[in-house]
């Protein structure tokens, strides 16, 4: 310690020499220890930087890595050993079940092959069906059938004809003929054509087949108008006879149904009521007079099949009871199938004159009677009336109407008494006395069958909602009968006939205030008077005169009132 320090510190106690020596010795030891430390540090640094130290470090690291690798190897060996054991077990299992797997593989292979073959067969059949479906319209067109009506033609039956008009626009179905159903159909092909004209039924079938070639439309060109001739009359008679004789056989068929069931259907059907004004009546009459008679009517409001079928049968029966038949001409016509009338499809379109829209059976019978009387002059003068056939047909038809309760006894007597009186006036014919007595007893004084005036007039139906429509029906039938007289003549005579029809329509319009029974009586009487005076439709020179009856007796003055 310096002298200044000591002076500043102040006075201190004096140090003994022994103490100073101890202190000097300690200082020297400290200096030596520090020097040694520094030397050791230098040596350490030299050792760390030496290669021996570095190699030793690497050795230690490699030794640790080797230990780790050995440990991993041991674990891998254990894992591989486990996998080997599992593989051995799986191999043993596969060897044990190889036979079962082979059997399953074979079975699955057969199932796959069968499934593929089945699919191929379905595809082949589908291709064949598509080919057949494509060929069917072509075959139908080659056969003269329209593609749109091919299906309907396979479901319907031959078209019945009445009074020279096509009763339905449906097509023909080819069915297996019944051996005992129509015995007269075999001899119908062997009859000689005494008229000198082709049969009307064959012509009608040919025209019906031509309809599809013209696009399926139900009309006939102007040049193919048909005249109402003896062949059409005998065709309707023969059709009714065949249907009457084969009613029992047709009732046994599953698809034909019985006549009683069809009558029940007729009773259950409700007719559509229409309110027709007088202007519409006159316009319809003029339109009918201007249009030619067509084979198939245009699309009109249709009626049900059973109702149309029954009306057609009754009209044919009235036809057979009021006109004569000729054996040679009957055999020259081939009737349709015995069940064709009963199998007529529902909803077929029918002319208004024969199956009215309101479904009045009595009105159809009266109209059919008037139309049949128009054809009576066409019968040959030397032809003899078959009284037995007419009487049997009339009796069967009367029993049919009474059985099915379509007309009451009074209405039936009123409708049929004019036919009975006409049979009395015809040469070589007699009215059935028994039938007349029965009708007279049941009807009483309501309808007289001995009056000359009643034989040419029909009783009036009570006024109801169908009064105007029935008057329209009679007017249409009257104009239709007049048109049938001039169809076969030249154009000038047809024009004159149309003018006469128009004049009659105007006359009916002017006389609209007349009562309904008087108008109906005048229309029907005018038609019957033509048949009564024996005017012929075949004569072209008397075509115009036939439209107006000639006055030959005071009784005929009542006929002229209709034209005034």
From Swiss-Prot:
Matching InterPro entries: Centrosomal_kizuma
Gene name, Swiss-Prot/TrEMBL: KIZ
Biased composition (Low complexity): 313-324
Organism field: Gallus gallus (Chicken)
The UniProt record lists the keyword Glycoprotein: no
Family (UniProt): Belongs to the kizuna family.
Gene Ontology cellular component terms for the protein in this record: cell projection; centrosome; cytoplasm
Intracellular or extracellular location(s): Cytoplasm, Cytoskeleton, Microtubule organizing center, Centrosome; Cytoplasm, Cytoskeleton, Cilium basal body
Keyword NADP among UniProt keywords: no
Entry protein name: Centrosomal protein kizuna
